[in-house]
């Protein structure tokens, strides 16, 4: 079903690329100002009908931060690396439901607390209805993500930088 655009809504960008976008927004505490993107020609035209196989995209963040992202159905990409002015950190694996392992440029161990993100989100939704309060994952966040995804697809189609106006 993941290779059927009608059912899935898109390819790896929609399926797993969203995790890259959310990680960048979370780590920087900001929303992208603009995007550029490229889609690699599919390797199997019978398999990848109407969906991309691999997408490279760049998120331009405030303060000159550039996030270089890649998502694919044919490559196993499961890491996140952040280069900072004073070093780097990485999660590898980054998107597993099980254990996460963080490495840092200074070699200091870093424990990553594991929680069930789905349980946390479902509990928040139930509590928000019960207590008439906002959920931790708002509709605004989902709207933001869809605007970014649409801009990435536009950048792939046009080959141009797409500015975002997200409020």
Predicted segments with their positions:
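C-terminal helix-rich "cap/oligomerization" subdomain common to oxidoreductases
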Residues: 62, 110, 127-167
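Soluble or luminal CAZymes and related metallo-dependent hydrolases
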Residues: 16, 117, 144
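Generic structural signal for secondary-structure transition and capping sites
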Residues: 29-32, 66, 87, 134, ...
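Predominantly a Rossmann-like dinucleotide-binding segment in NAD(P)-dependent oxidoreductases
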Residues: 1-47, 159
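NAD(P)-dinucleotide binding in Rossmann-like oxidoreductases
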Residues: 39-41, 45-54, 60-122, 166
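A general structural signal for well-ordered alpha-helical segments in protein cores
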Residues: 20-21, 119-123, 149
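Short amphipathic alpha-helical segments at helix-loop
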Residues: 4-9, 106, 110, 134
């Amino acid at each position: 079903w993941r290779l059927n655009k009608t059912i899935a809504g898109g390819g790896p960008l929609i399926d797993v690329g969203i995790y890259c976008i959310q990680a960048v927004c979370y780590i920087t505490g900001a929303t992208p100002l603009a995007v550029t993107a490229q889609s690699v020609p599919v390797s199997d035209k019978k398999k990848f009908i109407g969906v991309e196989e691999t997408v490279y995209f760049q998120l331009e963040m405030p303060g000159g931060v550039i996030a270089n992202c890649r998502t694919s159905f044919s490559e196993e990409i499961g890491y996140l690396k952040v280069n900072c002015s004073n070093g780097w950190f990485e999660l590898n694996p980054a998107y597993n439901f099980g254990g996460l392992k963080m490495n840092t440029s200074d070699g200091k161990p870093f424990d990553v607390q594991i929680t069930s993100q789905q349980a946390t989100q479902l509990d928040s939704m139930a509590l928000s209805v019960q207590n008439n309060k906002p959920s931790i994952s708002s509709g605004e966040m989902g709207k933001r993500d869809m605007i970014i995804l649409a801009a990435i697809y536009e950048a792939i189609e046009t080959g141009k930088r797409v500015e975002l106006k997200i409020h």
